[in-house]
Amino acid sequence: MKKRYGVIAVLIAVIALGVGYAAISNVTLNVNGSQATAEADQDNFVVKYDAESTFTYTGNPTGSTVTLTRTNDTNATFTIEGLTKKGDKVTITYPIINASETLKASLAAPTITNDNTEYFSVTATSPAAGTELAANGGTANLVLEVEVIKTPVTDDETANITAAVVASPVQ
């Protein structure tokens, strides 16, 4: 009987050591409270006028001049002189490029102001609302048509005209 108790005692000791060793060798590692932050940076979204703008005449605007100037990446000006009669028209094209590395751009339809609608019609034939420019080089054109719709009789007529296109970032 003593022998039996001795064998049982040895078995219990071996099992206890095995369980104890297993409990000591397991370690759980946790990571808590860490976070990743990605910040919006306006420098990641670059849509601008590209290269030189162009223009064409319609009608017979002899002696007319058009001056196009890009004052910076997002502002351009034009001056049209010498249009004289109904039907004289100038079409101006401003190339737009998306220089963003990873973001696409969605263009809104141009908004136009014209303070002399009696003598001048101004329309934007492009871009259409929702025009999407691919990242890293997608292009579109802002095309403006300025037309004399009534022949001036007694005084020279002028108009102050603006056009704006809003570009929104798209993933």
Question: Where do the PLM segments sit?
Answer:
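Residues that cap or initiate secondary-structure elements
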Residues: 28, 42-44, 53, 100-102, ...
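Surface-exposed interaction patch
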Residues: 17-18, 25-28, 45-48, 72-126
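Short, polar/proline-rich extracytoplasmic segments that appear immediately after membrane translocation
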Residues: 1-69, 170-171
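C-terminal, structured domain-capping segment
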Residues: 88-108, 135-171
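Low-complexity "stalk/linker" and mucin-like segments enriched in Ser/Thr/Pro/Ala/Gly
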Residues: 45-48, 52-73, 116-137
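Generic marker of residues within folded, mature protein domains
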Residues: 12, 82-84, 132-136, 153
